[in-house]
Swiss-Prot record:
It catalyses: a UDP-3-O-[(3R)-3-hydroxyacyl]-N-acetyl-alpha-D-glucosamine + H2O = a UDP-3-O-[(3R)-3-hydroxyacyl]-alpha-D-glucosamine + acetate. Its cofactor is Zn(2+). GO terms for biological process: lipid A biosynthetic process. GO terms for molecular function: metal ion binding; UDP-3-O-acyl-N-acetylglucosamine deacetylase activity. PANTHER family: UDP-3-O-ACYL-N-ACETYLGLUCOSAMINE DEACETYLASE 1, MITOCHONDRIAL-RELATED. Catalyzes the hydrolysis of UDP-3-O-myristoyl-N-acetylglucosamine to form UDP-3-O-myristoylglucosamine and acetate, the committed step in lipid A biosynthesis. Its EC number is 3.5.1.108. Zn(2+) binds at residues 75, 232, 236. This is UDP-3-O-acyl-N-acetylglucosamine deacetylase. The gene is lpxC. The lineage of its organism: Bacteria, Pseudomonadati, Campylobacterota, Epsilonproteobacteria, Campylobacterales. The active site is at 259 (proton donor).
Length: 294
């Protein structure tokens, strides 16, 4: 099985979640071995989507350096992972990816329009060989060896609308599109107001987030899934793990995880070469792992 890129260039436009300004986005094909690269056209600077380039995880996953940064990359990265795309250049004219509708379905539609092109170099996959875990109080994220890639995610909020939710996701592109891609980011009205006081979250609205005010959902259309909150956390986790550079063949388990914990997990994993193996999917090995690309 070979690496892929997109078959043709596609363009889109959206709003930035934090600045609230229009953002142009363009996806361009790249050759094998290039990986996922973000290009700030307004600065003329490129950033590879890798754990070592992450500079902030407080509100979103942010890559960059002293010259500039690209924020809120996780939803786009999640869609790229689901479509099995190894190499693509993302051109942005601002410091964040557009929020779209708060989920990754808009990016999935862009990738559908672009199509997928197979390249002439074998695809790689990261196989988990032993468990790696990161904890913060009672919160944790863990990667473990498995025969089938599973994401088992639990969240628990002191709010009756969310409460405790668990979702077990068996990874495949079709499952992702049906179960995960449409799950939107969410937040509490009081937090939105605090963010705006700091000149952040200016692009957030009921058009691109589920907003909760005490015991009610403000979005007139309600939820897309009864457990949309935990499904979106899975969407985020997939995006964060994509910074490892290839699809992860492992069992990801989380209780109250976050962008911060996901980033620390990728760093902890890469510190221990015995915890993983990067496998080249030549014909002789592909059958063992083909389920992850179903």
């Amino acid at each position: 099985m070979n690496q892929t890129t997109i078959a043709k260039e596609v363009k889109g436009i959206g709003i930035g979640l934090h600045k609230g300004e229009p953002i142009s986005i363009k996806l361009e094909p790249l050759e094998a071995g290039s990986g996922i690269v973000f290009y700030r056209s307004d600065l003329g600077i490129s950033y590879e989507a890798k754990p070592e380039n992450v500079i902030d995880t407080q509100m979103a996953t942010v890559i960059g350096d002293h010259r500039g940064y690209v924020s809120t990359i996780e939803h786009l990265m999640s869609a790229i992972n689901a479509y099995g795309i190894d190499n693509v250049r993302i051109v942005l004219d601002a410091n964040e990816a557009p929020v779209m509708d708060g989920s990754s379905i808009g990016f999935c539609m862009m990738l559908e329009e672009a199509g997928i092109k197979e390249l002439d170099v074998a695809k790689k996959i990261l196989v988990i060989k032993k468990s790696v875990e990161v904890k913060e109080g009672n919160k944790f994220v863990r990667l473990s060896p498995t025969d089938m890639p599973i994401i088992n995610y639990t969240i628990e909020f002191d709010n009756p609308i969310i409460g405790k939710q668990n979702y077990c996701f068996e990874f495949s592109k079709q499952n992702y599109i049906e179960q995960i891609a449409r799950a939107r980011t969410f937040g509490f009205l009081k937090d939105v107001q605090a963010l705006r006081a700091m000149n952040l979250g200016l692009g957030g609205s009921l058009e691109n987030a589920v907003v909760i005010d005490d015991n009610r959902i403000l979005n007139p259309e309600g939820l897309r899934f009864k457990d949309e909150f935990v499904r979106h956390k899975i969407l985020d986790a997939i995006g964060d793990l994509t910074l490892l550079g290839c699809r992860v063949f492992g069992d990801y388990t989380s209780y109250a995880g976050s962008h911060k914990l996901n980033h620390l997990l990728t760093k902890e994993l890469l510190k221990d070469p015995s915890a993983y193996e990067v496998v080249s999917l030549e014909k002789s090995t592909y059958k063992v792992y083909e389920k992850v690309f179903a």
